[in-house]
């Protein structure tokens, strides 16, 4: 179900001069020993970004997962990009969460970087869900305009393709023009905030339990610390 989104993102990263990097050994692909499931991940080097990761999990008709997170360079204070798409085939249920995840919860920061996301939120009512998704703590590292959809096949086949494309374009519009935003957060502080994001996310990642159930605790712990949120390791060593 989500392969077209993977292809679209890959093409966009290539257009923006992205290059594939090596994923830590043993984490680029894993097959479940208990169930018919596979997870694959990619890491990109993209100008203007410190790290751009992508993950695709395939459990056939039962479950489909697509995730991507982009970390801007430390010289760029723009939000972290986060995408989570989940399709529960047995229940015909879509959960989609797309956001420019803010480094700080400040009005001036929102005024600088969220006009595009605000516009998307206003135009796509399907992604303006008032219901929180239990797995996500929307009070931390989410913006007031997070695109949240709890839908079914109708939303998955109608509005999601357009939201996905426009969301990516809005995010790249910020990065391609970041100099005009007059970044006000110093690079060292941006680094600290991105480290804090990884530390928090590694402790609260809603997908970690899912990964453990399919791929085991040992592999999932490595995946969490070494691929998903590698900056969280700094805390473990202090």
UniProtKB/Swiss-Prot annotation:
It comes from the Bacteria. It catalyses: 15,16-dihydrobiliverdin + oxidized 2[4Fe-4S]-[ferredoxin] = biliverdin IXalpha + reduced 2[4Fe-4S]-[ferredoxin] + 2 H(+). Keywords: Oxidoreductase. Transmembrane segments: none annotated. The keyword Oxidoreductase applies. Catalyzes the two-electron reduction of biliverdin IX-alpha at the C15 methine bridge. This is 15,16-dihydrobiliverdin:ferredoxin oxidoreductase. It comes from Prochlorococcus marinus (strain MIT 9211). The lineage of its organism: Bacteria, Bacillati, Cyanobacteriota, Cyanophyceae, Synechococcales. The gene is pebA.
């Amino acid at each position: 179900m989500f392969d077209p989104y993977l292809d679209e993102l890959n093409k966009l990263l290539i257009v923006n001069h992205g290059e594939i990097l090596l994923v830590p050994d043993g984490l680029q692909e894993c097959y479940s020993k208990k169930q018919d499931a596979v997870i694959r991940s990619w890491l990109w080097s993209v100008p203007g970004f410190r790290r751009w990761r992508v993950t695709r999990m395939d459990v056939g008709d039962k479950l489909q997962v697509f995730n991507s997170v982009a970390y801007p360079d430390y010289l760029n204070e723009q939000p972290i990009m986060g995408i989570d798409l989940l399709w529960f085939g047995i229940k015909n249920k879509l959960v989609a969460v797309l956001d420019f995840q803010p480094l700080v919860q400040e009005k001036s920061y929102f005024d600088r970087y969220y006009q595009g996301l605000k516009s998307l939120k206003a135009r796509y009512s399907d992604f303006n869900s008032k219901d929180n998704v239990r797995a996500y703590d929307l009070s931390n590292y989410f913006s007031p305009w997070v695109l949240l959809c709890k839908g079914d096949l109708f939303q998955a086949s109608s509005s999601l393709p357009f939201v996905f494309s426009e969301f990516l374009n809005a995010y790249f519009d910020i990065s391609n023009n970041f100099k005009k935003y007059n970044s006000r957060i110093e690079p060292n502080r941006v680094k600290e905030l991105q480290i804090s994001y990884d530390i928090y996310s590694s402790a609260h990642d809603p997908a970690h339990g899912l990964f453990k159930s399919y791929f085991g605790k040992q592999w999932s712990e490595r995946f969490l610390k070494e691929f998903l949120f590698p900056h969280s390791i700094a805390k473990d060593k202090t």
